[in-house]
Amino acid sequence: MSNSITSDQIWQPDHVLALWPTGAPQAQGSGVLHEPQLTVHLPPVAQANGCGVIVNPGGGYRILASDHEGLQVARWLNQYGIAAFVLRYRVGPTYPTSVSLLDAQRAVRLVRSRAQEFALDVNRIGMLGFSAGGHLALAVATKGDQGDAQAEDPIEQQSSQVNFAVPVYAVTNGAKRGRKADEYTPTDESVNPQTAPCFIVHTHEDAIVPASQATLIYDALLRAGVKAELHIFNDGEHGVGLAAGDPDVAEWPKLLLRWLRRRGLLAHEERCAVRGSVLCAEQPLGLGWLTLIPKHAQHPIARTFLHKREGGEFLIAKENGPIVGQHTLQIHWISQQAQYDGSGRYSLERSLMYECAVDIVAGQRLDIRLQAHDFV
């Protein structure tokens, strides 16, 4: 029995976009290795949420791992309503990484220029990359521009700034890595307060790109006040992609979805501020949490910490607020003590929870009045 794959079984992209239809700048020849492009992978129309991600396969700026770091990632994103665009960027030794960056920036401009066609929100376009592709995503995130308003090419008038970046086991600084400093420019040194928020993934076991490359960029983002989340898994070789064979490391795509949701990147509706109060027997809780979990699976969760010193009042700022509509409200009461001391005394044997359905309305207060027996 033959397991060979025939030519008509090889997957073909939905749609291909040449980055420069009339020829790429600095091209050293013709053919696939000299003609950068995007393959377009769109979710079902009814499922699309307006978020778009450009996917950069890795390969050390020499090859492109286009299956498990390209197509398969795009199809996974599509399952969650996210439009995906796999980038074929030019690689060495023919092309320096400055040309790869030129291709990636052009890809962002091209996607943004056709946002209406692809039902995208121009403020929710990100870049996800693996290894060298992750370095490329960070280079774009730290070197974006607003476009050239005077350019004859309308695509060049578009911004190359991404709204978020996802570097996965990425090189972030070649010099500090100790290899190929000329190819892997120091992205950490280019981080500034305008750098896009980042979701960073790495593994401790990576013997090709050490996990210190991930902490390097995270520390730079932290210093600059840029929103970032870092996950370093113990297990996992370099190049795991979505990590289909490792149930633990395979949690990172799920964590990414949660991060995108929490940042409001999976919803087109505007967030709102929520002000209100929580009292139990007309008294504020010592310490607790108020959490708003939306009925819509892709709307962001909102929450705030409750402290007795606020007299039961709370405010969730618009930036971190919910989207109007139906939510499950949870109040977690974790201590009757508003201020711990050195006595080590206990006030609650376990955290207590109250839950109910609420309808969030912009500008309307959320005042909750409870009794101790309402908690479980």
Task: Name every feature range the model reports, one short phrase each.
Residues 207-216:
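Conserved alpha/beta-hydrolase "acid-adjacent" motif
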